[in-house]
UniProtKB/Swiss-Prot annotation:
It comes from Oryza sativa subsp. japonica. Fe cation binds at residues 240, 242, 296. The lineage of its organism: Eukaryota, Viridiplantae, Streptophyta, Embryophyta, Tracheophyta. The gene is ANS2. Keywords: Dioxygenase, Flavonoid biosynthesis, Iron, Metal-binding, Oxidoreductase, Vitamin C. This is Leucoanthocyanidin dioxygenase 2. It comes from the Eukaryota.
Length: 373
């Protein structure tokens, strides 16, 4: 089977009425799946449905500074996700970014294959259909484009599409702007802990004896979720937490993102002029669990294509030791909940756990006479 035939987009375009078994989620996962459009419509019609918090951070630069810090702190602690208004990302830049990403995915699959990655060889960046193994052994209903977007001098620009021509300049512009936004949010989140505003960013970057520090890394992943004939059986991205410190998300207006809160899945609504921000594992570790790395997933739709742009803000892979901030453990305030690890070690440990869970699931299935798909 060729790479083109392996792409989820190719399956969608083939007008199949069923989906291959490797995309059918386990029975226990399917109880609350459904068409993203229908699920979002039901949530919108339910006046009592929980809503992800909306926080305007433009107030941080004015008289509303204290209230802004408190609102962000509460959202990070109670939800681990929030809609951010007043983020300072110009609407025209976001429109150009969306247009460029959608134009890339509108290209023939064979043309996109020029940027194909090779996870088996350790090359995760590029165009692909799966980033990592999962516990169930099932595949996700998405294709994607994944590459470093900041700092620019570390990026492999051979993975940045030459077509459309707008892709490179707008992605570079967007990456720099999100980097500035990340610093602002980390400052607000530091103050929410009762610590100096530079604390979290400083601990996410390396400082050696010469005062030199590594920059934060921003990875851009464009998720492309084609139409799916059985959205009640498949997911775009399965339930997971991000390994990053923060994740910034915008989309093409089609719903699908869900966050797990208080024992239920809450659908992210379309909040005009906002972007979604997730707290990731790295920040949860630094704050010793005060800020929550949100469990989330993405549904798919029978009638609509969903595209989302996610920027993962990450510490350098090996030069920073992630561990709970000592300031939060002082004077017997608490015990560390996380062992010290580099970011690379954390990612590897999480991947190993996924593989181990999959092996255990396969072994259990085999013992019951079931052949894992």
């Amino acid at each position: 089977m060729t790479d083109v035939e392996l792409r989820v987009e190719a399956l969608s375009l083939s007008d199949v009425s069923a989906i291959p078994p490797e995309y059918v989620r386990l029975e226990e996962e399917r109880t609350d799946l459904g068409d993203a459009l229908e699920v979002a419509r039901a949530a919108s019609d339910d006046a009592d449905a929980a809503r992800i918090p909306v926080v305007d951070i433009s107030a941080f630069d004015g008289d509303g500074r204290r209230a802004c810090v408190e609102a962000v702190r509460a959202a990070a602690e109670e939800w681990g996700v929030m809609h951010i208004a007043g983020h300072g990302l110009p609407g025209d830049v976001l429109d150009r970014l969306r247009a460029a990403g959608e134009a890339f995915f509108a290209l023939p699959i064979a043309e996109k294959e020029a940027y194909a990655n090779d996870p088996a060889a350790g090359r995760l960046q590029g165009y692909g259909s799966k980033l990592a193994a999962n516990a169930s052994g099932k595949r996700e209903w998405e294709d994607y484009l994944f590459h470093l977007v900041h700092p620019d001098h570390l990026a492999d620009h051979s993975l940045w599409p030459a077509n459309p021509p707008e892709y490179v300049p707008v992605s570079r512009d967007f990456g720099g702007r999100v980097r500035t936004l990340a610093s602002k949010l980390l400052a607000i989140l530091s103050l929410g802990l009762g610590l100096p505003e530079e604390t979290l960013e400083r601990r996410l970057r390396r400082h050696d004896q010469h005062g030199v520090d590594d920059d934060l890394l921003l990875q851009l992943k464009i998720n492309y979720y084609p139409r799916c004939p059985r959205p009640d059986l498949a997911v775009g991205v399965e339930a997971h937490t991000d390994v990053s410190a923060l994740s910034f998300i915008l989309h093409n207006g089609v719903p699908g993102l869900q966050a797990h809160h208080a024992g239920t899945w809450v659908t992210a609504r379309s909040e005009q002029g906002t972007i979604v921000v997730h707290v990731g594992d790295a920040l949860e570790i630094l704050t010793n669990g005060r800020y929550t790395s949100v469990l989330h997933r993405s549904l798919v739709s029978r009638d609509a294509v969903r595209v989302s742009w996610v920027v993962f803000c990450e510490p350098p892979p090996e030069s920073v030791l992630l561990q709970p901030l000592p300031e939060l453990l002082a004077n017997g305030a608490g015990k560390p909940l996380f062992a010290p690890r580099t970011f690379k070690q954390h990612v590897q440990r999480k991947l190993f756990k996924k593989l181990k869970d999959q092996q255990d699931n396969n072994a259990a299935a085999a013992s019951n006479g079931i052949i894992p798909k």
